[in-house]
Design a protein with these regions (language model features):
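Post-transcriptional modification and biogenesis factors for structured RNAs
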Residues: 1-168
Length: 168
């Protein structure tokens, strides 16, 4: 890709501020846009939210929406809906520039009517059948890094530096 592609992360009705803060930090570190769709289970100035995101908030490109209708009216997709119910794996998809990875609330996921209307774009992360779901912020991180891997990690550092030693 010649220009840096855009990846969008969408949280629909998040309930737990620490999860949203962790997702915000992931978005800041990977240059993803974050879209928060209400109603949310916390105030945006919640201390737990800010603490989980550390001091990365100024790196964040974030938008807020009153609900799904507001979000869809302002964004054109393509959308990929992460759900525990889908038959297609997240690694079986080739993600285009401008993709929106959409995640539901921690306690309920995405509305089933939305999933049923968009079956071809519903994807899942494989896991044991004895567990309900992965943590929201972990799921977002896995999804983000799969897309960035496919895009060859555009404009992200691929090496680090030791503080007191040199790599050989």
């Amino acid at each position: 890709m010649s220009e840096k592609p855009t990846l969008n992360i969408v949280l629909v009705e998040p309930r737990i501020p620490q999860n949203t803060g962790n997702v915000a930090r992931t978005c800041a570190c990977t240059a993803c846009r974050l879209h928060l769709v209400g109603p949310m289970g916390f105030a945006i100035d919640d201390k737990k939210l800010k603490h989980a995101g550390l001091d990365y908030w100024h790196y964040l490109d974030i938008s807020y929406y009153d609900g799904l209708d507001d979000f869809f009216a302002k964004n054109s997709g393509p959308y990929y809906y992460f759900t525990t119910k889908a038959p297609q794996r997240y690694t079986d998809v080739t993600y285009p520039d401008g993709a929106y990875l959409v995640f539901g609330r921690e306690d309920a996921g995405l509305p089933e009517a939305l999933l049923a209307a968009n079956q071809e774009h519903c994807i899942r992360m494989p896991m044991r059948d004895t567990c309900r779901s992965l943590n929201l912020s972990n799921s977002v991180a896995v999804g983000v890094y799969e897309v960035l891997r496919q895009w060859d990690f555009p404009e992200l550092l691929d090496h680090g530096h030791l503080r007191d030693y040199q790599w050989k």
